[in-house]
Amino acid sequence: MKPVQLILLVIILSFHSLLAQDVKSNKGNANGKTFKYHYIEPSGGKKGIVILLPGSGERFQSVLSNISLAKQLVAQGFVVIVPEVHTLLYADEYSINILNELLKAKVKEYGTKSLILGGFSSGGAIATRYAEYLVSKNVQIDLKGLFVVDPPLDLHRVYTAGINMLQNCDGIIKKDGANIKAQLENAFGGSPAEKIEQYTSNSSFTASSKDGGNAKFLINVPIRLYSEPDLNFVKKNYCNKLEKADINATDLEALQEYLLKCGNNRCEYITTSGRGFHSWNIIEPNNCLKWIIKISS
């Protein structure tokens, strides 16, 4: 059997094992629009809610089958939910409203306000921004913690990285750079130099701001930031003109440094080697599960 076929078989079998735990799908309404979400419930009591936000273009099946953490969380009594939100580089108003409506419904249904937020790539950026939103708005929810995998957090840096990709790379990386530039300029009406306030207010973290921008709302939140900052891999496989400032690990490293200075000693920046660049697989599930159980107790 070829390696690719074997990988696909493992994913299919993993997902079918999750189906045995009854992956359910439902719909909600936000801003007059219907959204979908998918979830797995434990058979017994509900310890809390874990919302996992997928990366751009990632389907819920991939999230639930590719990370064994989801299965282990359900076994420990957590409800695991994967909503379908906009796959933007940041949390727009619609994404925030989707999460608000979803959370409101599930808190009422399960009778628990205990919440863990997690996400990968752009989903991690949305999860981070939503955590900040919950704190800034004093939402009556028990936010236990946040864990994210390689998200783009500082839109000022992301825009600059996009320009570098557009001007100095070829092929799909050049196209990605053009898409980043277009998406952010269309959303905010121009470049960071022209629309600094819009970029700062929509970023999860702004390294150039003394108060960290929205990151100041994370000072009391337990956080795990995961990344595999393999610049050699990036240069070899994507574009040899890319530098450290062009990868998302730059944001995570700077965010942890900022939060530690602010007194958040529960913010961990976890780097790996050989687990896969920009992948859910960066998370070691058993270790992460222990952390979630600890902060939820």
Q: Which functions belong to the PLM regions below?
A:
Residues 46-47, 53-91:
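Short substrate-entry loop that stabilizes the transition state in hydrolases
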Residues 90-110, 129:
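Alpha/beta-hydrolase active-site loop
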Residues 107-109, 113-170:
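Primarily recognizes the serine-hydrolase "nucleophile elbow" in alpha/beta-hydrolase
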Residues 185-268:
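Serine-hydrolase catalytic core
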